[in-house]
Structures are given as C-alpha cells and as structure tokens.
Amino acid sequence: MSATKLTRREQRAQAQHFIDTLEGSAFPNSKRIYITGTHPGVRVPMREIQLSPTLIGGSKEQPQYEENEAIPVYDTSGPYGDPQIAINVQQGLAKLRQPWIDARGDTEELTVRSSDYTKARLADDGLDELRFSGVLTPKRAKAGHRVTQLHYARKGIITPEMEFIAIRENMGRERIRSEVLRHQHPGMSFGARLPENITAEFVRDEVAAGRAIIPANINHPESEPMIIGRNFLVKVNANIGNSAVTSSIEEEVEKLVWSTRWGADTVMDLSTGRYIHETREWILRNSPVPIGTVPIYQALEKVNGIAEDLTWEVFRDTLLEQAEQGVDYFTIHAGVLLRYVPMTAKRLTGIVSRGGSIMAKWCLSHHQENFLYQRFREICEICAAYDVSLSLGDGLRPGSIQDANDEAQFAELHTLGELTKIAWEYDVQVMIEGPGHVPMQMIRRNMTEELEHCHEAPFYTLGPLTTDIAPGYDHFTSGIGAAMIGWFGCAMLCYVTPKEHLGLPNKEDVKQGLITYKIAAHAADLAKGHPGAQIRDNAMSKARFEFRWEDQFNLALDPFTARAYHDETLPQESGKVAHFCSMCGPKFCSMKISQEVRDYAAAQTIEVGMADMSENFRARGGEIYLRKEEA
C-alpha cells in the first residue's frame, strides 16, 4: 500500500504522463511472436518466454548445458506487448479486422448517426478538447442482412476471426517437443468437450451451437478476436470506469492498457460520471480486447439519475449510440420481472445489482413489466445489425452468503434462458451472468442450473465470493469461488479487486484483481484438463528444481513481484545462481537435497551396473572376444 496518497491533480498528471510516454514493451526475457493463418491478415500474437539452458555436467572450466525450449503463452496485450510497434493513443490502434469486415460486403457506412445523443455531443464545440480526434465512421448491416459471428457460423462460414481464435486457443503448444513439458494429468471436465487440437471448424461449430461467443462489434475493428465458452480457455474480465466523484479520461485509458498488460481478456467500461461518451470513444479506439458496457447506467445519467424517468426511447438511443461507437457486448437486465421483485423482500441484503435495482425501482414505480423484457426483440434487432453480443444480467444475484441460491435468483435465471432462445432467433450471441456471493458447497448447482435452463450458453460470473468476512481481501474470497466455478464449466470470470465493497479500484488494485483471477482461471483450466494448460507449470517446476532463478521469475504471472520478493533477502547477483533460497538456506534446501539424492542414486546404479558386468565377464571365462553363438 502506498505511503503517500496522490491528489486528484497528481493522479491525472501521472496518467497523462503514462499515456504520453507509452511504448510497446514485453515482459522480462520475453519476445512477441506471431503465428500466421490461411486467411489474409490472420497473424496471431503470442508472448514467448525465453529460458536459460540447464547445466547437465562437464567441468567448471568446460560445463555442459542442455537447451530449454521457449514457452509460448496467450497474450492479451495487443500492440502494447510488441516493442516493435509505435504507440500513439491520440491516433488509436490499427484496425486489424477492417479488411475482413469490408470483404464480407454486408455492411454500409452511416452518413448520419442513429443516436440523437451522439449527434448532440458531436455538435457541441465545447467538447472538442476532450474528444478523440480520429472519430470512426460507423457501419451497420445492410438492409436484410445480419452481421453476427453466430449468423456466419450457422451458415457454415469459417470467418478469419474463427481461424484467429483457433490458433490463439492452441497457445502455440505444437511448438513444444519436450515430453517433460507436455506431460499433463487427466482432468475432470464435467461434460466439457476439450479436443486435443482446436480447429477453426471446432470454433465455428461451438459458436453455431450457442455454446460460445465471439464478441466482435463491426465498429470495433481494433480488437483481436477472442472466444468465450466452456470448451475453451477460461477467460477473465476487468472492470474500469469513472464515477461522479473520481477518475478522468486519461486515468481510464491508463487502466485499460494496464488491464490488457496483466491479462484481461475483456474489459467492461462501467463509467457513471461525466463525459461517458467521450471516455468510451477513447477506450474503444485504443482497446485490443472486447469492450462491454451496462447501457442502463448511461441511460440513467441522461435522466439525471431518476430511475422512474427512464423510458424505452432513452434506452434505445443509448443502445444505438454505444453500438455505433463499437461496444462489443451489452449487459441487459431483462430478467428482472415485476413478479420477482417481492421474492427479494425476505433477503438479508435485498437487490445488490445496480442495474437490477434500477429496473426493480422502475417496475414498482410504474407498476409495469420491465421494459427491457417487453422490448427484448427490438434490442435483439439492434444487436444483430452491429454484432453486439448480449450478456444477460443477473439483476437478482445474491449479495450475501445468506441469500445464495434463493427463489429470486433462480427465477431470473430461468427467464434468462427464455430470452436466450429469443436472441438466437435473431442470430445474436448470448452469454449469461451469474453470482455473486455463494458458499463453496452451493457453487456447483449454479453451473448445472445454468447449463440446463440456459441451453449451454456461456456462463459469466462475478466470483462468486465464498465468504463475507474479508473486506479488503475479497479478491481472495472470490478467487476461490472463481476457480471452482471455472472448473465446473464457467466460461468467463469477472474479476474482483481488493477494493470490492470499499471503493473504486486504482491501477494497483486492477493488477491485484487480475493476477488473482488469472490464477483462478488457470487453475480451472488445469482441473478441466485443457490441452497444454500444464506446460507452463511443468516449465516452472523444472526451473525451480534446477535453481534457474531468472527463469522462475520470468515464467511467473507477475515476474516483477516474484523477483522483488526474492531480492528482499538475496539481493546480490550471486543469489540469482545460488542453489538455495532464503527460506531454508544452503544446508536445508529440499530441492538441493533431492538433487544430491538423485545424483547419488544415479552413481550407485552405475556402480552396481559395473559390478554386474564384471561378474558376468568373469563367468564367461574372462575372454575379451566370444564366438557368435556364445555372445
């Protein structure tokens, strides 16, 4: 924890400096590699961790070494992870997917924005200083067309996005030759299909079946294709966003870049403060990962925070505004029905979802059914025209252990299953949001209920938190639940930071939340038996046993912290080659003792083998050469 708290002015200046000096950079001893596909422009980035050789013998003067293979890993940092790419936040990222979108010939550029709010913002000269300079000309589907990845998948079309994803999900493991590294324990997948090699056809089939989604708005061509589904790697989402009392555009862009560096597969912009529209434009134009939003937040700001004043017209305009900016998925709380609200009355913590409480208040104020539910087909029509995926929000999720798995929670879940089928009629991609606060013994039911009632659409959960007693450490309490539900089949985990329940996260909180959730997601991949998931673990264990300290740091999810902790007690360069660490010291290191035991056993085997050969030689008469029939 920082000793001195920065002022708001200092925080903003720090963020501005970060943006002004931003360069592509790799993690220590890593390099960016690209694997090309068959579609034009399919060039999939990965991070390759370079390892030092293993000492296998020889003398002090002439040591003998054995090379260790470089380890390729999934990389979400986009151009920010490539030192060869010049970064200019003012111009935004290269439009990777634009040629693929244009080649399909089913979109058209809009000469006039569809959103009245967008038109008003663009006409306001007072916003020129805040505005992203290179505003994208938005596209939408041509009349009579749908432009979603689900639509293409159902038609049997393998898009460049699907091939990109197949290469990415395989994580370059075909490059690994060592049997030691390729060894993997059998997993327990709870019904997930995990092929040894992920092909573009497998990706297409999973998307067509609704078991996976590719969030990829046609107006966010800067994003690198990724997939969310239980038959793929478990993904992690990071939340950023300003509020009425804190943060600026500069700080949110900084948090975006920071999030992708530390492994965020998607980012949700949950801004509720000033300049929401302008902040989102900066984020989208500089994001290599899909961006999600909760449109009801901005709609509420447009009616001055008064839930009762919300209307379908305001909400629809907000959907069009965000879809034409390039938002990849919307969280829509369409399952909070009027008849479900009384079910929450006996809860300890009531309705804790911000979106859920907004819609519950609207329903009660008007004594009408949720307009998001009533107008759901119109929402789907908008999404189909831009390929905005739907994340059906769990507005009635439990906010405490006591309220877990109650009547209101599962009633809403069943409604989300009904809405999923409606969205699929429009070829709109869907995932389902889940809890929340759930004790460990009750977590698996959430997954089985979702699979059954939501037709195997991908599940996306906030944690769940497994206990309520640890404010300040809820990244731990939720990381436990996240690892479990990821193992059971959850496709994406929404991170929780140490500030959960306490305040808006800063940069360091974002990192802590992401590292915790990358651990949870990876642990789930190991438990499921995802092919290749154990390679990095095996490489780390081998480096640890061989006292290759630099390799241990570099293979870590957070190399900087690993190195810092080691150097607190052994800061000298000699500590980086020592065959012990500060925990046990040189005489009591279990790994060193194990090596000595192994060397002794090997020597004994040789000695016994030589004795056996000597006895055999004497038994044969001591002749150097034997006749062929005697040999």
UniProtKB/Swiss-Prot annotation:
Annotated catalysed reactions: 5-amino-1-(5-phospho-beta-D-ribosyl)imidazole + S-adenosyl-L-methionine = 4-amino-2-methyl-5-(phosphooxymethyl)pyrimidine + CO + 5'-deoxyadenosine + formate + L-methionine + 3 H(+)
Which residues fall in a coiled-coil region? none
Q: What does the entry list as the binding residues for substrate?
A: N239, M268, Y297, H333, S353, R354, G355, D394, G395, L396, R397, E433, Y460
Q: Which family does it belong to?
A: Belongs to the ThiC family.
Q: Does the keyword DNA damage apply?
A: no
Residue stretches spanning the membrane = none
Q: What is this protein called?
A: Phosphomethylpyrimidine synthase
Q: Which residues bind [4Fe-4S] cluster?
A: C581, C584, C589
What is the recorded function of this protein according to its Swiss-Prot or TrEMBL entry?
Answer: Catalyzes the synthesis of the hydroxymethylpyrimidine phosphate (HMP-P) moiety of thiamine from aminoimidazole ribotide (AIR) in a radical S-adenosyl-L-methionine (SAM)-dependent reaction.
What this protein needs as a cofactor is: [4Fe-4S] cluster
Which pathway does the protein contribute to? Answer: Cofactor biosynthesis; thiamine diphosphate biosynthesis
Q: How does it assemble?
A: Homodimer.
Q: Which UniProt keywords apply?
A: 4Fe-4S, Iron, Iron-sulfur, Lyase, Metal-binding, S-adenosyl-L-methionine, Thiamine biosynthesis, Zinc
Q: Which GO terms describe its biological process?
A: thiamine biosynthetic process; thiamine diphosphate biosynthetic process
What InterPro entries is this protein classified in?
Answer: ThiC, ThiC-associated_dom, ThiC/Bza_core_dom, ThiC/BzaA/B
User: Where along the chain is Zn(2+) bound?
Assistant: H437, H501
Which organism is this entry from? Escherichia coli O1:K1 / APEC
Q: What is its EC number?
A: 4.1.99.17
